[in-house]
Amino acid sequence: MALKKPENMHYEEAIDELENIVNHLEVGDLALEDALKQFERGIALARSNNQKLQKAQQQVNILMQQDAQAPLQEFNDE
């Protein structure tokens, strides 16, 4: 099965694959060439997801600017 390009994957799908890659690399039973391929794939997935997060943040900022009347509140995770 051919791998999807990271930019064509959903965020959650890429996270799942990235977690699997990390698990395989942590076990340490891959040949060097395979480990490098997995590492390269992981970097591509991480970069793609970072771009998706930045785009989502920009969309949130635009929406918040459009609704300037809505007051911003501090986030409290307690």
Swiss-Prot record:
Keywords: Cytoplasm, Exonuclease, Hydrolase, Nuclease
One cellular component (GO) term of this entry: exodeoxyribonuclease VII complex
Enzyme Commission number(s): 3.1.11.6
Listed GO MF terms: exodeoxyribonuclease VII activity
Cell location: Cytoplasm
Cytoplasm listed as a keyword: yes
Name of one Pfam family that matches: Exonuc_VII_S
The keyword Transmembrane belongs to this UniProt entry's keyword annotation: no
Catalytic activity from the UniProt record: Exonucleolytic cleavage in either 5'- to 3'- or 3'- to 5'-direction to yield nucleoside 5'-phosphates
Coiled-coil annotated residue ranges, if any: none
Enzyme class, first EC level, given as a word: hydrolase
InterPro entries per the UniProt record, alphabetical: Exonuc_VII_S, Exonuc_VII_ssu_sf
GO biological process, one term: DNA catabolic process
Record note on quaternary structure: Heterooligomer composed of large and small subunits.
Family stated for the protein in its record: Belongs to the XseB family.
Annotated function: Bidirectionally degrades single-stranded DNA into large acid-insoluble oligonucleotides, which are then degraded further into small acid-soluble oligonucleotides.
The protein, known as: Exodeoxyribonuclease 7 small subunit
Organism ancestry: Bacteria, Pseudomonadati, Pseudomonadota, Gammaproteobacteria, Alteromonadales
